Structure formats: C-alpha cells, structure tokens
Amino acid sequence: MRISKYKQVASAIFYLSILFNSQIASATVTLPLRTKKAMVVSANPLGSEAGLEMLRKKGNAVDAAVATTFAISVVEPFSAGIGGGGFLLMHSAQTGEMKALDFRERAPLKATKNMYLDAQGKVRPNVSINGYLAVATPGTVAGLYELHRRYGKLPWQEVVKPAIALANNGFILSQQPTWRSLPVYEQRKQAILANPAARAIFTRNGEFYQPGERLIQRDLGKTLTAIAKNPQDFYTGNIARAIASDMAKNNGLITLEDLKSYKPIWRTPVCGNFRSSKICSMPPPSSGGVHLLQILNIIGDTDLKSLGWHHPDALHLMTEAMKIAYADRSVYLGDPDFVKVPVQQLISPAYAKIRRGQITMDRAKPSIEVKPGEIGRGGE
C-alpha cells in the first residue's frame, strides 16, 4: 500500500480539524425523550444510526459510542473528525465506576510559546485558527481504540464498518446547520477553497455540494479501512507517514515522532454535590467540569424553579456565576501535566459562598470588572 494513497485525505483531515469550532444553535425547544432500553444521541441521525446498529448486534454502549464517533467524522467532518481529539466520561451501571479519558490533541514537539506572534510580539491574525500551524497531534483514533480495547464487546472492525460505508457509498447532505451554512461564511469558504485536498472533496469544480446532493469521500474510506485493520497505522504506518510528509511540505509542525509518541490518558473525574445529586464531569485539562461544579455551587440552594421560566433574577444569578467561573478559568485552569490546578479550592462550597457574596442582584457587573478569586495559587 503506497503512501500516496493517503496524501489527499491526510491534508484534508488536518485542514478540517481546525475549521468550524462552533455550530449555529437552534432555538427549538422539545420535550425530553425517554426509553427503557437504550438510546444513542449525536449531532447527525446517520451517526446515531451507526451506534444503534451496534446495539442491535448485541454490542454494548462503548461499541455504540465508538461507531457513532467514527460515523460523525464522515457526516459532520467540520465539527468532529479523526484529525481531532476529545474528552470522554464513562459510567458503569453495574459497578458504579466513573472513568474519564483524555484524548485531546497534543502540541507538537516543535511548537513554541510565541509561534502565533509576529516579530513585534503582536498576534498573527487567524494563524491559530486556520492553516497547518493551527493543527496539533490528533488523538481521536488512539482514544477510541483505547476505549474499545478495554471495554468494547464487538470486534474493532465491526464498529468502524458503518463509517467506512458512509464514506465509500456517500450520504445525502441534510439541512443540518453545518452543511447549510458552509457556503455562507466567507472566511471558512475561502479557507476550504484554498486547500487543494479540501476543495477536491467538498466542492464540484469550486462549487460547494448542497443539501440534497450526495457526498462521497473515497479517500477517507480508504483511510478508515486501514484504521479498521490496524489503528496504529494512523500513528506509525502509511497514514502517519503521509501526515508527516504533508506537514513538512506546508510548514506544519507535526512529525512522525509526535504521532508515534501520542498516548491517551485515563484521568480521575472531578465530582461534587449539588443538592441531593452527585455531579461528575471531565477534569482538567478540560475546564468544563470544574466550572460546572463551581457555577452550581454559587447557585447553591436558590430555588430557581419557584422564580419561573426565564425569570430575570434567575438569569441574572446564572450569568453572574458564569462570569465568575470564567474569570477564575483565565488564571487557574490549565493542563495538569504541566501546571498545578487548584481543583478542590475552586469546587469547594466555602469558596463558592465567598464568590456568591460578590454578586449584586440589582446590578449586572461588566465582565471586565469580574476578577479571579484569591485562592492558593499554584497548587491544591
């Protein structure tokens, strides 16, 4: 199998991994769905169907999650893909065990502190968002394989199969916000058009595929087929060599050494209590779990329900609590592999009480006035 087979998809994988950080939110409010058996939820019905297929084949939740994620990388490539990474939280109903898997992207070994600054020390516009310097060493394939290796039930090839079919046979573009909005945002549109591999995949002679048309990604199908046979091919085999070659030709930083040394990390979930419930979430380097608990602690015993839907006082309290969490995030949150993060102080009820006392219910404080709290810096 020649390296050249993967060059186009390698280029597209990493170019698309830095596009479309956000999605257009829907204002539609629907009632929650419930089931007594199992449920798969994702950003696209085709992704959810891939997960359901695993459950129908007597697979478990891990099989469904892995199949869904691979399928999403085909049908929603601008929001998730094998060129990216992720965080995963897993709960075992049988044992009560909570596990957190960190398979986020890692900075390449050649990355430097000032790589996004010019000679005058000013930020280089869009360099950290678009292009090869914006890309970090991907973790999705390694993370999904690690998860499946430990907890999956069906064969690895089986869980990758739906994604391969979607890539090889194509799928009809839906009215999902991703595809509907793609040709509209000029900056994103031009970024794709400027990349030969992305242009060849997502346009027909420079015109973007429209909802209702079929998109086929055969090169991605070949890559996924290789991953199904041996996921390590992505990090040490032909796919890795194609990625490293493409990076070198386009002033990117990822090397074979970066890919070879990548390993996902199992971490301990961050947990706390909110009223009668135990809340667990992703720990650092994710900031979400710590600050979710911090926000809930600040809200405390305030009866938001009695205030009514969208009551100004309820919205005000939640907004001010979020401002406080984000102010703390700017100073205290980071990657625990490199810095000490004061998790326990940030999520402590005593600290939340102090911060709650800084909220004035009759005045919205501008974000610039909300300062980080005074806690022990540099450790727990």
Task: Outline where the language-model segments fall.
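Noncatalytic scaffold domains of N-terminal-nucleophile
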Residues: 27-49, 53, 61-229, 234-236, ...
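Bacterial N-terminal signal peptides
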Residues: 11-22
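Internal maturation/activation junctions in enzymes
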Residues: 302-380
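Short helix-capping/linker segments at secondary-structure and domain boundaries
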Residues: 149-154, 231-233, 299-306, 329-333
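Bacterial N-terminal signal peptides that target proteins for export
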Residues: 1-13
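M16/insulysin-pitrilysin zinc metalloprotease superfamily fold
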Residues: 193, 289-305
